Amino acid sequence: MVAAVLGGLRTGARLLIFLALLLLAFAVATLLRLAGPRRLRPAWGAGWWSRRALALLGIRVQRHGPRSRGRRMLICNHVSWLDILVLAASEEPHFIAKSEIRHWPLVGYLANSVGTFYIRRGRGGATPLLTALVPWLRAGEASFVVFPEGTTTDGRDVLPMHPRLFEAAVAAGVPVQPLALRYRPDARGRDIAPFIGADTLAAHIGRVLASPGLTVELHYGALQTPRQPRDVLAWRAETEVRRCLGLAARAAPSSVHVGAPAPAAAPAAEAAAA
């Protein structure tokens, strides 16, 4: 009984602080818009806020593997909206989102303020994105994150990765670093991190706020060179994500002709803190 009451009080307190953090997010977003990207990096604002949100939610990030430095295309398996907080807090990258989000109330305002790139679903939808993204990368701007599976999963497997967005790395000559996220069950043994199926955002946020805390592993995979066809690059990046998660490699699709190993991509790297 006492534990239930204390748990309810903790959830209520977290909810109030989370609402305050949301108000702070809009304040930061407005500041970024007023200052402009040359005075304040939008990705810095998202990272600053995400680190505080993770602390409030009781989410601890454990990092494993060599973290490369410099501009990169970061690709990652997709489990939850929490992924965005984890990656923004760890890397301060730009993100790619579906074009509908641009016009969503509140969320669209935040996404636009932190320099999100947008992609339209369907045939030819990636062309406008690539037109904007490739020169941006060639100009030496920051890294960006792609979730090439195209949807969220329960985290137990990795879906085939769509190769079309890998064209940005190939065209700009930017290396690809695979990332792998694994959420551990909470202290009550529940897998609450996956945001899948008919789940609603409000209900999921409620479960996360009520949880005693989560641990997420962020694994940095081996850097992949852009000097290979995008289909091959996508398959190799997916294979590296699967390796980081302890999963067997998926057989190469018929469109992928894997010959000799790809040439190594070796910019400076630093060990990720555990």
Identify what each model region corresponds to.
Residues M1-Q62, Y109-S113, S211:
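A transmembrane-helix-recognition feature enriched in membrane-embedded lipid enzymes
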Residues A25-R41, L54-L56, G70-G124:
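Catalytic core of membrane glycerolipid acyltransferases/transacylases, capturing the structured
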Residues R71-M73, E141-F147, P175, E217:
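Residue-level preference for the first positions of well-ordered beta-strands
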Residues L106-G108, R156-W235, L247-G259:
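A cross-family acyltransferase "interaction/gating" segment
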Residues T116-S143:
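A membrane-cytosol interface segment of integral membrane proteins
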Residues Y118-R120, G221-R227, E240-R243, A273-A274:
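Polar-ligand-bearing catalytic/cofactor-coordination segments
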Residues L133-F166:
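Soluble extracytoplasmic domains of inner/organellar membrane proteins
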Residues R236-A274:
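Cytosolic-facing loops and C-terminal tails of multi-pass membrane proteins
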